[in-house]
């Protein structure tokens, strides 16, 4: 089926086919209340648009603002919206444009195709499948006869909240019992609900926005609608999962957020990181339930059909069945494949990634933002192909979705505020804690309303009642420990045919959908009939709004919310006229609107001590520098402690920033963490349910030998499954009770740090307004303030990174060291009972089994059940920390006492110990593995010195390790031939030193009497990034690793004192080549001996990132040109082969070219052929990632597969230079890195012309051409790659090669 989108205007005439007068499916008077009929437009086959407000589920028949507060803090109401013909036409055009955007990508077209073709299972009448009101809409013909047309989806305008979107299945039972049902969507293409990425993955955004930016983004209405379309798909297939959900505990603590239950259907539909919290047991039940439902429907409905018709032909395609009329059976394998695709591949996050749309990280918003309006019909604001991120408008890197864009109009939510009041239990508990100006001024007599420049004004507590108001969205979200309802861990008696569900059977996450073929699309029957069957059941009627209960709670002490309020500045304060003072007294800040609480003493002193009216730019600049330094130093501070035989890097100011831990150790947050662990961070320490298992049982009776053996094996496998299920339930409880609280703490931390930065901003603006120097300097100072704000925001980001590391490690520790061991105790009892059962069973069947087999099975049972199944740490949904923190690297970093690297264009110690660094004038920064690397050159002034301190001093008994990345250029001359020159040393007759000689790295460790020397093989000579790790166990040995592989070990037990007071010096000492240089990145020193496992993990962390890397190891970049070579044919690059007769040029490999090193070694030339441009990106940092879809351009022409000349299995790669020859130009780039090699593969997507393939090469002679190395897409390689000998089959491995100063071919 070729999907077509019909174009309409609202005033188009009724034609009875695509434009009708529709009777609303919800025609019940109870729900509809006489609404309609409405004009409806069939925009896609079986998909209709009705430009009317969706108001069928509103019991009050009222679109006005609710008279009571609701939980949705970002709702907006306008009862007059979508009333006029012009508004209805605008809505119609808006929805059509969004659908066209969805259709613009193959995945979106597949989704629309699936919805268009997915007719719900009809009823049976007179032996034939017959449509009912569950699959059709009714319309009024000119002769007043009511007829019916097929409809799978009806898209309406928004409901009461004009920025909200929702999906409703018409009937409640069919959405989940396998039948399926027509769906209605209420959709708002012009009114959107923004989201923020306060502590998300896209941190580099502040580098491209020249202002203090709140990272608030507008959703693309295409991704919003696709979310609803996924729900529609679930409804049409009858697999909507509404029986599994999290209930949120609103009564455990008084500061709990009021929140509706979160059904797992929403997590599956949204996808992303939170969907990882869904237990595999629940996934198993979802799949089993769907299979059981479909099996029942086939048996009880489909097999009662006796008449063949078009509907039956269609249903046999939609539901994979085997057999003949009256005896159909479910094709389980095909059904599971389709089910896995619809449930686990189709989701908003996956689809948004394919469309290069930024979506929020979590399904639940931590901070709802007021809605916005945008005219998406303006092609300069929103395009069909790129949405808001229009590259020609300069909106790359998601900048087009930033709320600061001019086309977004912010609209303040007009719903009543949902908040609680927190009041002191005793009226005089503290001095006037409520000082929010918008509230206290309403309660003060006019004669008391005075304006003063002094900052010590206070108001009596009796006047202000001492209460603060806290928004519902800021309260703690905690899941009920029993919210995983309907979890039944019991098992039937084990039989020979018992099946076992394992996690590794879950579907692969192929988000391209390119290999999924929904065959029912080719057999959609087109049926119009006047008489349809009516279902005798209640229509599904959702709840309109979630009402919020305003309450007052009374406290005896200050809370986190008081501390947050004390850091807030009222919006009414004019920063040009009123100076905001920072204070370390929460009481003062709460009682005075011109004071802000801050725990950062140095920064506060710098802010407060400067006189009003700075007189020169020099003083102003120095003041700004001091602010940045103080704020960066104080927010970057960490304390390292040992807890539970582990090392933890604590962010010490979190306690005084948010009033955490005082119940445990007042004023000593670090001590509180050391004593209580994560419980010091939690508002509520939850109980969790430890699942109780009864030992497995087996069937008895007459059994054959093979059946007995099968029962034992199935029981052992089922035991493993039960362990996995219990682990997953425990993980889900942790996510709901611990992880969600940590998310709230992180949101509070970000809010507090942002308010600290805002207080600084207000002071800078005040000083600028009152500047007493040369008036012409103000513009320069304003620019300096803007730059300062960016640096402050980066300090906030770094502080959040430290906080995330700290909190997630505690959270992980609680799961693995508190929860899991308790669960394992019960599981061991379960194993004991199971073992007794199996031993007894085997003994009873010994006469069937024989002595040898009986003994073997008992031994097998004993071995399996005496071995615990480890909890997989990688199964934890580490959400927002994925690209910041690798669990293993995090543990290593806690011992890190030096990390010399580059950040924000400066060389600094990134370890948190803030070493004193002196940098020579000829030290430079260059492109590195991730960001910037340090370039040490051959000149005398290219030197870095790090002063000795207590962290870097190692006694004769102190173990330590050194690890660093090095990129050493290939030699261009023989000046250093045979010369050893130093790279870095802490050496003065004794100490340690790292040198280079003939491209080999040398490690020295020496005291006054003894020394060792280890020389690496020739691994660092060829300009690629290599990880060198040197570990030292003072009682054993020193080991050198290269790229995680152990090179050599030497005994150092006889080496004693190696301490020197000299600095650590980086320089190319004794180097003879003034043009020589070396790049270093992340030079780290650890106060421990890293074991081999940690070294390997440290190296693998580099490859665990999803960056695609060029041949040197640097991240691949969009909009940059590269040479391309295949691993199979070094020295041959890509070129175009002109062939005009077909309007099509082939891409082939060039002739081979070699270069010779100064030492007479020959290599294939890397800079050969034509450069290839990687086109387009909506990535914030412009970097290419695994599974990205890229476009390649050679000589200014797109590369791809021509539709004019194709073969299903083998297709030549070419370009077009005309406008009539289409190319399939998308390549999916796949990460295939190995040690020392940074290659990738380029996958061409499946379409009607060709199968998916891998770009490869082949020496052949096509018709009319010579023998050449042709470049083509091979379906065979794609299908067989995983099973090939990869040392022999390297034709599909491609290197991207940029020109690099470390590799000279001139």
Swiss-Prot record:
Disulfide bonds join 423-467. Pfam families: Peptidase_M27, Toxin_R_bind_C, Toxin_R_bind_N, Toxin_trans. Its cofactor is Zn(2+). Its EC number is 3.4.24.69. Residues 462-889 are annotated as: Translocation domain (TD). The active site is at residue 228. It comes from the Bacteria. The inactive construct (Ala-360--363-Tyr) can be used to generate antibodies against this serotype. Additionally the enlarged substrate specificity can be used to understand the function of VAMP4, VAMP5 and YKT6. Zn(2+) binds at residues 227, 231, 266. One of its GO terms (cellular component) is host cell cytoplasmic vesicle. GO terms for biological process: proteolysis. Binds 1 zinc ion per subunit. Residues 890-1103 are annotated as: N-terminus of receptor binding domain (N-RBD). VAMP2 cleavage inhibited by EDTA. A motif (Host ganglioside-binding motif) lies at residues 1274-1277. GO terms for molecular function: metalloendopeptidase activity; protein transmembrane transporter activity; toxin activity; zinc ion binding. Residues 505-555 are annotated as: Belt. Coiled coil: none annotated. Changing residue 467 to S: Slight decrease in cleavage of VAMP2 by artificially assembled toxin fragment (light chain plus translocation domain) in neurons. Residues 1104-1306 are annotated as: C-terminus of receptor binding domain (C-RBD). It catalyses: Limited hydrolysis of proteins of the neuroexocytosis apparatus, synaptobrevins, SNAP25 or syntaxin. No detected action on small molecule substrates. An interchain disulfide bond is required for toxin stability in an artificial construct with the light chain and translocation domain; which of Cys-461 or Cys-467 forms the disulfide bond with Cys-423 in vivo is unknown. Belongs to the peptidase M27 family. There are seven antigenically distinct forms of botulinum neurotoxin: Types A, B, C, D, E, F, and G; new subtypes are quite frequent. This toxin is not recognized or neutralized by any of the antisera against the standard serotypes. Botulism poisoning is usually food-borne, either by ingesting toxin or bacterial-contaminated food, or less frequently by inhalation poisoning. In both cases the neurotoxin binds to the apical surface of epithelial cells in the gut or airway. Toxin undergoes receptor-mediated endocytosis (using a different receptor than on target nerve cells), transcytosis across the epithelial cells and release into the general circulation. Once in the general circulation it binds to its target cells. This is Botulinum neurotoxin type X. It comes from Clostridium botulinum.
